[in-house]
């Protein structure tokens, strides 16, 4: 009898710890860090073209009702074709933004977010070289850029602290000599502290 009681207690305790606990998800003032990899969407180019990529690191802080604010530092590189030469476009950007939940499932495991951000940074074109290999002069120049972005993301809880993210972003950059509107797709992981 005593052995059965101890065994039953152990089974109940094991089951309690194996069930997911949602108590520590999305609480106000909770912080998180995310790492994302991205690809720019360029008209007429393949989705995963050579030398077109981006990486970003973000710090987030949850507010009330599952919404959050974020600071995102991002580096992006694009290879713009010119004859048989590629002109490199490199951006280092800092975003300050807000995300608001639009939809979620009943278990609060999958979320669809929408948001906005202000951004600023520096854009470098062709490593600041004015002459191209065919001796043509590049009129576009490197400079500071600023603007805003709209964001959409699907966030899936893998564990109570680890999330998988798929994001879409549409940036509007002022001060740039190249593409003012730049859409981007990204995926990554977030760890909530």
Please report, for each region that a protein language model flagged, where it lies by residue:
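Outer-membrane beta-barrel "beta-signal"
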Residues: 32, 95, 181-193
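Extracytoplasmic loops and strand-loop junctions of Gram-negative outer membrane beta-barrel proteins
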Residues: 38-41, 79-81, 133-138, 169-172
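Membrane-embedded beta-strands of outer-membrane beta-barrel proteins
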Residues: 55-57, 94-98, 150-152, 156, ...
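Gram-negative (and chloroplast) outer-membrane scaffold detector with strong preference
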Residues: 58-132, 162, 191-193
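Surface-exposed extracellular loop regions of Gram-negative outer-membrane beta-barrel proteins
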Residues: 148-168
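Cleavable N-terminal export/targeting peptides
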Residues: 1-29
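Short glycine/proline- and aromatic-enriched beta-strand/turn motifs that initiate or cap beta-hairpins
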Residues: 22-72, 190-192
